[in-house]
């Protein structure tokens, strides 16, 4: 694997995360109080570091998974309030929908998919 291809791929994933975060903040950002240690939306240099939501990916080698290696999609709601299951489901559904669109737009020639692997969403397919 070429390190520049790896860096390019992860950079695109980062920007998709920013896009997902932006939409979630627009649609649901006022649903709960933000954690007191977290800046309000637009106050940090990076959109993932402020507001109610944080959307990131992390690589997993996939040991013990029926899908194998991939990138986990982590959507966090950063509040001290109790978040009900219905809201979590709505956020995950919308976030994954936006993420799926982003993958198709940025990697039209790759056969990437998002699957539910246990209780986490994972991007699988030929990354490089």
Swiss-Prot record:
It comes from the Bacteria. This is Uncharacterized protein BB_0097. It comes from Borreliella burgdorferi (strain ATCC 35210 / DSM 4680 / CIP 102532 / B31). The lineage of its organism: Bacteria, Pseudomonadati, Spirochaetota, Spirochaetia, Spirochaetales.
């Amino acid at each position: 694997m070429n390190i520049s291809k790896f860096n390019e791929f992860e950079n695109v994933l980062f920007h998709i995360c920013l896009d997902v975060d932006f939409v979630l903040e627009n649609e649901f950002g006022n649903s709960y109080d933000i954690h007191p240690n977290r800046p309000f939306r637009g106050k940090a240099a990076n959109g993932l570091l402020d507001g109610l939501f944080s959307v990131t990916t992390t690589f997993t080698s996939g040991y013990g998974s029926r899908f194998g290696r991939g990138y986990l999609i982590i959507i966090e709601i950063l509040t001290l309030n109790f978040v009900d299951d219905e809201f979590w489901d709505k956020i995950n559904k919308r976030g994954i929908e936006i993420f799926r669109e982003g993958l198709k737009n940025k990697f039209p020639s790759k056969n990437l998919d998002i699957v539910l692997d246990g209780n986490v969403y994972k991007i699988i397919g030929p990354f490089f």
